[in-house]
Every structure is written in structure tokens, then in C-alpha cells.
Amino acid sequence: DCPSDWSSYDQYCYRVFKRIQTWEDAERFCSEQANDGHLVSIESAGEADFVTQLVSENIRSEKHYVWIGLRVQGKGQQCSSEWSDGSSVHYDNLQENKTRKCYGLEKRAEFRTWSNVYCGHEYPFVCKFXR
């Protein structure tokens, strides 16, 4: 089972953190919460719906984005997008922008679309680990 304050879906535990951090700091924070903790990866439409609901229930502020664990890695033609937990992107809901390398759920779209945002901005975030 998941610890108290965490929500479960499938084989994973999730928690929205309202503290605002950069993508890197949020990923580091998630890794400190559990052995295989990371910013959330979203690997199916069902999981996307679950995460959207969780974020909507927890984030009431005017912050425009909530970090997820997706970041464009590498330079130029060698770019690949992968989740911070190492899983590859099979399910996606991306809005592209070449200069912004990290992804967040966009409040304006009710946290349903993934928009790329400058990684140094500070936003709330969602952590995930396998239970």
C-alpha cells in the first residue's frame, strides 16, 4: 500500500507537492521521497486522467503549470524525450516548443495537456514511485 498522504493507481503511488521548485530540484526531491521516486511519468490515457484529477483536487493556486517527469534530453538532432524514471514515451500529449526542454501540465487546459516550459521556472509538481 501507499504511505498516508499518497494516492494509488495501478502499481504506483502519487503525490502532488505544492512547494514550488525548478524541474531539476523537483526531480531530486521526488527521488528522496522513495527508493525509485521520480517526477510523475504518464504512460496511458487512464493514468493521465488519474493524474489530472489528482492535480485538480490539490492545486488551487494561480500557478500556470505543474511539473511532470518529461524532459527533452540532448542537443540538436540528438534530442530524445524520455521520462525521468527512464521509461520511454509511448503515450503523449505534447505541445512543442524548441527552447523549452521540460514539461508541465497546463492549468489553462485543466491540466490535461503537456506544455514545454523553461526548466528553471519554479512550479508545483507530482511525484510517483512503484509500491
UniProtKB/Swiss-Prot annotation:
Disulfide bond keyword on record? yes
- All copies of the C-type lectin domain together span 1-131
Q: Which cysteines are joined by disulfide bonds?
A: 2-13, 30-127, 102-119
Q: Which domain of life is it from?
A: Eukaryota
Q: Keyword Disulfide bond: yes or no?
A: yes
Q: Which SMART domains match?
A: CLECT
What is the role of the protein in this entry? Potent platelet activator that aggregates platelets via both GPIbalpha (GP1BA) and GPVI (GP6). Induces a tyrosine phosphorylation profile in platelets that resembles this produced by collagen, involving the time dependent tyrosine phosphorylation of Fc receptor gamma chain (FCGR1A), phospholipase Cgamma2 (PLCG2), and LAT.
By what name is this protein known? Snaclec alboaggregin-A subunit alpha
Q: From what organism does this protein derive?
A: Trimeresurus albolabris
